[in-house]
Amino acid sequence: IHHYILEQIKTAFATEPNIAATIHGQRRIFQGCYRRRTALFPSKKCGGSIPTESRLELAHAVCLEQNPSVINYRSQALKIKLSHEQYCYPDFLIQTIDGCYEVHEVKPSVASLALDEYVRFDRIATLLHILVLMYHPFLFVPYQPFLFLTYH
């Protein structure tokens, strides 16, 4: 499973934009779905448009674009197997200037998380820690920037 994730990282950053200049991840985000706030964020760092599922993800993409320590990123780029039939698609895969990779999950608030989501975050963090990948759930707190939680 570890080799599979590392191969996905390599493939994600080798993926070229399609004819519409969009860079899709493992899980495609379709634009124009009813009651969803999807967007395409044009990114110089990525060399194409990055699809996002929400306004919060769009705001995070803007932050990544402006962060000087980030050289590249992709949305929904990893498909992580959690159990026999359960998969997880973290929101962002990030490549930093020091050659490291980070995985970010963006959620609206701590209060909105169910217990099973905390358990899922912990399982993902454990799996990615073995691969020496940083896993950061970003939880938006009103009137503050992002609450930065790091799992080591």
Regions found by a protein language model. Give the residues of each.
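Electrostatic, structured charged patches in enzyme active sites and in nucleic-acid/phosphate-binding
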Residues: 1-152
